[in-house]
Amino acid sequence: MKISFLVHSLYNIGGTIKTTLNTAEALADLGHEVEIATVFRRREEPLFSVDPRIKVVVLVDTRKTAPALTGTDARLAAKPSRLFPKTEPRHPQYSRYADERIIEYLRGCDADVIVGTRPGLNIAIAAHAPAGLVKIGQEHLFLDRHGRRLERKLYRAYRGLDAVTTVSSTDADSYRKRMPRIAANVHFIPNSIPATSLPPSDVTARTIIAAGRIEKIKRYDLLIDAFAMVHTEHPEWTLRIYGHGRETKTLRTLVEGRGLHDSVQLMGTYTPIDAEWVKGSIAAVTSEIESFGLTIVEAMGCGLPVVSTACPYGPPEIIDSGVTGLLTPPGDVEAFAKALRGLIENEEQRRAMGAAAREHAKRYTPARIGAEYAALFESRLSARERTDTGPALDAASRATSPDSALDCHSVDMSTLRLAGPADRLSLAQAETTVTPTGADGAAFVNLDDLDEGVWTVLRDGAPVTAGRVDSRALTRAGARADTTGIVVPYAEPGTGALLVRVWRRDWFAEVTSVSWHEARLRVTGRLLGPGLPKGTATGTATLRTDPSRVHALTTTTDDDGFSVEVDTDALTLADGGGAGLWDLRLSFDPESAGIRVGKVFDDVALRKNTHRFPERVGVGSGRALRVKPYFAIDNQLSIKVTEAD
């Protein structure tokens, strides 16, 4: 069969795109020809990797580099869509020009099966796809989300489809009940999630992980409040939230207001995410509604028990409460905190639930879900008496994925394993190149071979895309007191290139806490490294643009810790009124500038956007100034002083 998927944008990030790619790849594995038509192209490359066997067709190119529309096309692009229902949330993004491009594609589509992936596109398929095609409408949300007006439009349109699929059985029941004329054509097929190639979490890390769009419906505010309740009893535990969205700023403000900035990190978007799930011991989901729960299955597949609200629709269908995780009433912060607390205090229960969760996640593999879709498509083709669909591709004719993405694994704090032959790999920094050592088809690089700074991983002399970066071993790196450095692999934001950040020194001042006490900023931390000097330490704040301007800080040290206090009212703007950037240092020698105070001993190579601190408005030099502590690009702690708005 030839199968075509019609999607809103392959170039965004989200569950619909990810599961469409998973299913498309599984169908290609079965020997079918697969293409994905994306209405919009908003960036150069998709955020998720696309199997080279899958053809991508772009209908509307909205990149800044795309040729400008002219004439009739430009006039149509300025008019709102007539094809896409106004009650569909994506309607404002569509135009008459997009309508024309969609209709043109559908009328010329030579596939055996065409699959829509959201209501507006399903309506377009029902109205304009050729009569001989098998037409499938996927529902990745749920019927109750659409409202009565859109529901009526869908009922009329969906009579022209051969099948409608939902990602939850509850939603399938809703369609059958409220759209009785198409009840026989409604099928429940869950989303697909590939099994991770990484070893599962050992659930001993003191980390809770949540992931998904940072939107109101995800109720991350409830998660923060529940974590705050648990954190008072278990201050060694941390929370990481992965994703981005419109509520990111609001969530940061809530974290700061709860005084959790040292324990809660907003990590941004990571792809693939399984290398992050394995760093946790508990997964948390606090949504009001989940049509499916892609992140739940991802976490389960990595061996994490999942604490989730029992919200409609997906979580109660996926999680067997007490076996693979725990379900709590939606909106009940105390119940959620109790569930977290129970797993935090019982490692054996975490381990048992994690193992059961990992086994249950096998239900959702792309091979299994792809086979369900293939069976549905074939049954609908047979019903149309179109049994001669051409020979399936044999295994030998299938394209194989290029070796573009490179996986890596942090063996420990100082050793990195690269998944490739050593004779093809190297690491480059400026004019310096280091060749890794090889063993059993893998390559190894060590801290002793690398200078401090950023290294680019090369394959055959060219930068390589990061695959799975399994750096979970680094999440416990701070416990080492005799280290001389750390090797942190990461994907470069924007390009996805595999980079390695190295910190290498005789000793380190590693930040553990930053807190405000009126106008004084207190920074505490650990002193690490075999070259740690003896004697009395002095902390300083130095103006970056004028190193002669130095403020001495109140400083205390003991055998392995330090504390400095900054009188922020003494800090000023830079000369000329620009932002004053003050770098914090610690020195045991009055004749030496010492070392920067920072935080480098974990898996976060770029901490500036993941670890934020509260800011303060005070008075310095007779004017209102905003004082903001932050981690600079090198993960060293600085203070930014600007004029208050």
Task: List each language-model region with its residue ranges.
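Conserved acidic donor-binding segment of nucleotide-sugar-dependent glycosyltransferases
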Residues: 320-322, 326-333, 342-347, 362
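Short hydrophobic beta-strand element within catalytic cores of glycosyltransferases
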Residues: 305-309
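N-terminal strand-loop element at the rim of the active site
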Residues: 7-13, 26, 30-89
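Aromatic "clamp/platform" in nucleotide-sugar-dependent glycosyltransferases that forms part
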Residues: 269, 288
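Basic, ligand-binding patches in group-transfer machinery
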Residues: 383-645
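A short, well-ordered alpha-helix in the C-terminal region of glycosyltransferases
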Residues: 335, 342, 349-363, 372-375
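Carbohydrate-associated surface elements
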Residues: 170, 192
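A conserved mid-protein helix/loop that constitutes part of the nucleotide-sugar donor-binding site
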Residues: 17-22, 206, 210-232, 246-253, ...
